[in-house]
């Protein structure tokens, strides 16, 4: 992935990404999720036990190496397994939790627009609460993200994979249906049919998808309560976001069970998914903990950023210009006071030496709304100059320090 440096220009990916991260964090916090941070390096077996030994992530995409003790270490390819491992190790699997995370992940795949081998991911997990309201909260968060960033041509797909027994019965029926056509399947789908039949539904092959049109539907294997949940979510949220029940929807990781979902946008082209998640009630016990109901979702931030158009930050910016080195200590104290009076305003102090002209150029380059200028004469008279930079009709004015404080508080 490219280096990230925030230059404040929302047309550039780094600055855009930082702003997206900030807003996503605010949404998570608004829903009362608590932050969790997990290690970048994990025991590689963690992902074999959770994501699935037959998954593309484990077989083709995971970055792993042997450490000095000959233990196989992996760079985390996703966040959920690490979160559950942490909960199990701390013996917190008997409690309920609402957690969010954000950070770098690694997968060895072909780099393309919005997809890098190192990428940033944001996610949330609701742990210890049975199916029901957590599903509504997940879709509510997804809708909030779509609304906050005004994502266009967007659709949320939802499905239910049923209980473990429902899933097994459906997989058996799917294998029986596809067995006579196995010679028509490509190598990848043939392998999936025998290792993880559910993943055949996610095939990118047009021939396979054509065969699946007459295949059994999971709708015929799940109970009425699961179908009612899907219908209820669609009914309650369809006036906020476009929602579709898609009984062919599966997720790419083996630990999913029950309710699953993804958000897609035609703006991304053929690979249109940018967010996904679902319930994984059995993952905690698979990793050595107690049986713990759980649901989560995640989105790749670089890919998500391709859908987002941001205008330059609306936060007020003020440049603080000191004209003489001998007054810097006293002038800086005034700047410190200004920052304490209004934390919503960004106050940029030009720390390097230079002329008024060069410092004003910097202020304009930084898109500052105002420049506050202090020279020897101003400090001696306990005054400061306020110069508007975006409104040519307003003239600069000299004010007392007390009036400067009042002006800054009111910004």
Language model regions located:
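Positively charged, Gly/Ser-enriched RNA/tRNA-binding surfaces
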Residues: 16-33, 42-43, 60, 78-92, ...
């Amino acid at each position: 992935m490219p280096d990230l440096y925030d230059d404040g220009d929302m047309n550039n990916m780094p600055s855009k990404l930082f702003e997206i991260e900030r807003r996503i964090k605010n949404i998570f916090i608004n829903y009362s999720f608590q932050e969790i941070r997990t290690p970048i390096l994990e025991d590689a077996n963690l992902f074999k036990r959770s994501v699935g030994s037959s998954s593309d992530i484990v077989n083709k995409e995971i970055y792993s190496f042997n450490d000095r003790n000959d233990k196989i270490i992996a760079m985390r390819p996703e966040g959920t397994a690490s979160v559950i491992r942490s909960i199990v190790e701390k013996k917190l699997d008997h409690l309920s939790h609402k957690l969010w995370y954000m950070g770098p992940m690694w997968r060895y795949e072909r780099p393309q627009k919005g997809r890098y081998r190192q990428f940033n991911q944001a996610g949330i997990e609701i742990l210890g609460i049975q199916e029901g309201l957590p599903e509504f909260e997940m879709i509510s968060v997804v809708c909030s993200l779509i609304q906050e960033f005004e994502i266009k041509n967007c659709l949320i797909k939802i499905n239910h994979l049923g209980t473990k027994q429902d899933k097994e019965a459906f997989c058996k029926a799917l294998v029986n249906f596809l067995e006579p056509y196995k010679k028509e399947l490509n190598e990848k789908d043939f392998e999936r049919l025998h290792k993880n039949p559910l993943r055949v539904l996610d095939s990118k092959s047009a021939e396979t998808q054509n065969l699946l049109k007459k295949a059994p539907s999971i709708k015929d294997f799940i109970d009425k309560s699961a179908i009612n949940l899907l219908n209820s979510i669609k009914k309650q949220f369809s006036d906020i976001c476009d929602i579709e029940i898609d009984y062919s929807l599966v997720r790419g990781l083996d630990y999913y069970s029950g309710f699953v979902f993804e958000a897609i946008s035609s703006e991304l082209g053929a690979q249109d998914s940018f967010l996904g998640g679902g319930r994984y009630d059995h993952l905690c016990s698979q990793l050595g903990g107690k049986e713990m109901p759980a649901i989560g979702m995640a989105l790749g931030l670089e890919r998500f950023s391709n859908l987002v158009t941001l205008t330059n930050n609306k936060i007020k910016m003020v440049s603080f210009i000191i004209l003489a080195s001998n007054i810097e200590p006293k002038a800086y104290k005034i700047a410190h006071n200004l920052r304490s009076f209004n934390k919503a305003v960004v106050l940029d102090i030009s720390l390097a030496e230079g002329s008024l002209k060069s410092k004003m150029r910097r202020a304009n380059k930084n898109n500052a709304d105002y420049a506050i200028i202090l020279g020897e004469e101003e400090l001696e008279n306990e005054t400061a100059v306020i110069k508007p930079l975006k409104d040519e009709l307003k003239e600069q004015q000299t004010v007392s320090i007390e009036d400067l404080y009042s002006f800054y508080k009111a910004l």
